[in-house]
């Protein structure tokens, strides 16, 4: 099968203002267009597997720190941070203050946001997905994948 890989992430990135890495509302807009110019069954959706930690107040040109999703959850737990969920972007986030008193915001993927992205594959009839940074795959991704789809090939 020959397919095109659609990178459905990096709206929020190292040098961007704080925001969801992979907002479902924006992914939908791209997919709505993509399926008008090519068969949905030829589209693989690229999937992010990391988080960003931005220092606040954010200043143009400052870099966010990259974390794994598991690392983001560990950080939230260590700081007793309340994990919140943006229902428009379908993304998890939290605020915390570091040991130096500096405020931060972290956007990451949790089981809810992963499920929301995986549902798009079936909803749009896509060929499947590819996962960026699969070498540090967070276990809930596997569990959700196996509960929702039949995995045919892992490369």
Language-model features and meaning:
Residues 42-120, 146-155:
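Glycan-binding loop/region signatures in secreted carbohydrate-active enzymes
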Residues 132-134:
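C-terminal functional modules
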Residues 18-28, 108-115, 136:
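Soluble non-cytosolic domains of exported or imported proteins
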Residues 5, 136-155:
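Active-site-proximal helices and loops of the catalytic beta/alpha 8
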Residues 27-35, 118, 142-149:
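Generic structural signal for well-ordered alpha-helices
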Residues 117-130:
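Conserved, well-ordered alpha-helix/loop/beta-strand core segments that scaffold catalytic motifs
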Residues 1-75:
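Substrate-binding surface in catalytic domains of secreted glycosidases
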């Amino acid at each position: 099968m020959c397919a095109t890989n659609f990178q459905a992430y990096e709206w929020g990135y190292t040098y961007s203002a704080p925001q969801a890495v992979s907002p479902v509302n924006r992914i939908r807009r791209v997919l709505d267009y993509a399926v008008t110019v090519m068969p949905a069954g030829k589209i693989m959706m690229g999937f992010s597997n990391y988080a960003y930690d931005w220092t606040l107040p954010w200043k143009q040109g400052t870099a966010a720190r990259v974390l794994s999703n598991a690392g983001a959850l560990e950080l939230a737990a260590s700081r007793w941070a309340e994990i919140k969920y943006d229902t428009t972007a379908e993304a998890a986030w939290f605020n915390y203050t570091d040991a130096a008193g500096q405020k931060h915001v972290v956007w990451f993927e949790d089981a809810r946001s992963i499920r929301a992205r995986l549902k798009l594959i079936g909803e749009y009839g896509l060929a499947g997905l590819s996962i960026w940074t699969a070498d540090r795959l967070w276990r809930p991704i596997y569990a959700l994948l196996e509960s929702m789809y039949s995995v045919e090939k892992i490369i």
